[in-house]
Amino acid sequence: MARRRQLYEGKAKVLFEGPEPGTLVQYFKDDATAGNGAKSGIITGKGVLNNRISEYLMLKLHEINIPTHFIRRLNMREQLIREVEIIPLEVVVRNVAAGSLSKRLGIPEGTRLPRTIIEYYYKNDALGDPMVSEEHIAAFNWAAPQDMDDMNQLALRTNDFLMGMFTAVGITLVDFKLEFGRIWEGEEMRILLADEISPDNCRLWDSKTNEKMDKDRFRRDMGRVEEAYQEVAKRLGILPESGNGDLKGPEAVQ
């Protein structure tokens, strides 16, 4: 097989040229970072689990007609995705106070919010992904008003669906981060959900104990990060085919 050309390497994933025009291969790494790279480490098997969890959730979203960049999983660490023009915004959906929201507003962590809150952050590691308003987004033309309407609608629909899915398996969806991209089909432009949905970009707490089951375990040096990710996969019924045995998985098939 011809070696694929690497196009981009981020903190948790690598993008390679896809087998067909308009496609990419997304490879999930075991690398973990926090504080925009200020803290880094390796969580063995994280890439394998995130690949499976994200595949499962993206396919479920497809079933309710939420468009995503996901096409299919290729192997334990890679999935085929549609190439999109990424909108330079992180869209954070919050149901329960935690993380930066608790710090900024002095709301005790774990307080259920009176309504779902959507926040926007400008994707720029050098600036620390600053929080921005819709006024900033419009002024700097990061996204058109129609793009924002589409992203907000998709974010809220995704939230409603995922909240129900996680509640059914005893997990509280505290908050999560989404990224979106544009794709052109002839003259028509559509907004798709991109990136991933996994314990790397969702805050997930056990519904009974509030035990953290996400990357906060790494951020806060709580330990048992791998076990937490495995527990999420187990509750969703999607551990790797080999079970817990080989979470390292193969290297990228290039």
From Swiss-Prot:
It comes from the Bacteria. CDD domains: SAICAR_synt_PurC. GO terms for cellular component: cytosol. It catalyses: 5-amino-1-(5-phospho-D-ribosyl)imidazole-4-carboxylate + L-aspartate + ATP = (2S)-2-[5-amino-1-(5-phospho-beta-D-ribosyl)imidazole-4-carboxamido]succinate + ADP + phosphate + 2 H(+). InterPro entries: SAICAR_synt/ADE2_N, SAICAR_synt_PurC, SAICAR_synth, SAICAR_synthetase, SAICAR_synthetase_CS. Its EC number is 6.3.2.6. Keywords: ATP-binding, Ligase, Nucleotide-binding, Purine biosynthesis. Belongs to the SAICAR synthetase family. Pathway: Purine metabolism; IMP biosynthesis via de novo pathway; 5-amino-1-(5-phospho-D-ribosyl)imidazole-4-carboxamide from 5-amino-1-(5-phospho-D-ribosyl)imidazole-4-carboxylate: step 1/2. One of its GO terms (biological process) is cobalamin biosynthetic process. One of its GO terms (molecular function) is phosphoribosylaminoimidazolesuccinocarboxamide synthase activity. This is Phosphoribosylaminoimidazole-succinocarboxamide synthase. It holds the Pfam family SAICAR_synt.
